[in-house]
Amino acid sequence: MLTLGCAYYPEDWDETMIEKDAEQMRSVGMKLVRIGEFAWSHMEKSDGIFSFEWLHKVFQIFQKNDLDIILGTPTAAAPPWLVRKHPEILYVDFFGQRAYPGVRQYTCCTSPVYRRYAARIVERMVSEFHSYSNLFAWQIDNELEINQVNCCCPACKSGFREYLKRKYKTLEAVNQAWKTTFWSSEYSDWEEIEIGDMDRNLNPSLVLESQRYRNLVYLAYIENQASIIRKGCPGLPIVTNNCGDPVDRHALFQRLSAAGGDLYVNPAHRLPTIAFWMDLLRGFRPGTLPWLLECSTTPWEPVKNLLELLMVHYHARGADFQLYFHWRSHSGGFEKSHGSFVGFCGTERPGLASFRKAAKKLLPVLKEFGDLPPPECRAGILYDFDAQYNYSQGFRSRSAEYGSKLRAFHEHLFAGGINSDLVPPDADFRKYALLLIPAHPHVSQKFADRLKNYVQEGGVVLLGAESGLFDDESNYISTSGPGHLQDLFGLEIRDYIRFRKSDFPNGCITFSGHFGGKTVRSECDCWIASIHPLDAEVLCTFDSGLYQGQPACTLHRFGKGVALYCGAAASDLKFERELIHYAASLAGLPLL
């Protein structure tokens, strides 16, 4: 059932203002309020000197107004006294520059000192507020790793080296796994190994392993706080919001009660883009509806009833809980100009009227339906934490392209009226008639076996370009590609060419063919494969270039199912859509 609310910062206001705001929140249809996530310095004004009286009063005021609370742990913004006492908790960027205090997320969650202080404030908050009946849920931290750089502080370097020792045992094993003979990079001492960062022309193996280590750090950081909350508030939901790419969000949200995220609509966001982010969020914890912990109070497009449209769209894609950021504008500080429902001088802003109207219209109607199930999806899109780093690092690095491929494949399904889940490699594929794999550089034997079983039993899979050519260390496999999947796709990939479309001012390499009798054609972009069919059917061939006349797209029947392969990164979105819709038709999925 749809539950609406907002983010609120009572540390900014006096009791009279809080009373007024609480009454108005309830009157417009709100039930939930998120507080506390940036209030550490107001809760602990100096080391060990806690001040919670004001927050108790907030709980009581909200309780009187029948408002439930999501209480945020305030660890996204450390107080100045803590930084002054322990400057070593500040993160350090790739070039050795320490963060400047005064912003948020300028601390390193690897730091044992910072974790100790974070645990202490969370323990005190649990002790103070666990008994309130209107304590509805906890939010841990805020937007972990959204703004922060990849930290390279001494604690991170030391932790990374210990992680490598546990994984590889010896330096010889590291050198062999990472192929460090290239660029004279062989290690003779553990202290020589520096933690990596994205897009710095570093060894891709180092970058991949660095991101795996950082992910474990973030998971442990969240778990440290979650364990404290579970002990003191058993049964209460625990969430967090919008973690960045360095966190394996499938793994993270399995440890929490639901997947939580933020979504701010701007003019660049069309409906398919919004649908993608909602489906991605829902897929992080299958079977549990996601929580939208921040969304726009004032959608940027000046379109009548847009907020109502978005509210319905969010709900239709699974968001039972929708909290809007934020209620009342800050009178000062960095985000004083951020969108809100109530302006700096107390006047209602246009978004509040839109919200009131939408809530009044929708809440009674949706209440009749009760709890809605998640959208039924017959198609899955593979999203893998490792793949985004294995795919993008190295010569002609393309960090943003993995996410772009996911969004494009999702949008093509969306355009055909097909709902899809974004799923990790260990998901149960059998619930899907169609599985799209935009890019999956490393194919393990275990994953290959599961994929073969899926197709053998009747599934349809489409594998995109640049898949199945790397090992688990981001090195090339020693056989033809796609790794462990030649029999499934009925082909071998023996070579490839990587290029830029801009390198061909007079027209790029093209390929063409037929999908179910329909003629298709596209220019290539970035990458083409040298495909040698074993027993695959050729759907498209290259029209020009070194691979002229060779296959570009193939189809292979395997057991009861079908395996499609596209050995070219297509620059034409129309072609890509035709390919995906053809795959959907083979899977028996109706198209709009």
Residue ranges and their predicted role:
Residues M1-L4, G29-K31, Q63-I69, S131-F136, ...:
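Short, well-ordered coil/turn segments that N-cap beta-strands
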Residues T3-E15, G36-W54, A99-A119, L144-V149, ...:
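The substrate-binding groove and active-site-proximal loops of carbohydrate-active enzymes
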Residues C6, M25, V33, F62, ...:
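Conserved, mostly hydrophobic/aromatic
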Residues D12-S27, A118-R124, N241-L252, I274, ...:
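Short, acidic/polar
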Residues E19-S27, L32-R98, V126, N224-G232, ...:
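Aromatic-lined substrate-binding rim segments of carbohydrate-active enzymes
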Residues G96-A258, D262-V265, H269-I274:
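Polysaccharide-binding and catalytic clefts of secreted carbohydrate-active enzymes
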Residues W190, G235, F253, Y264-L592:
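Carbohydrate-binding surfaces of carbohydrate-active enzymes
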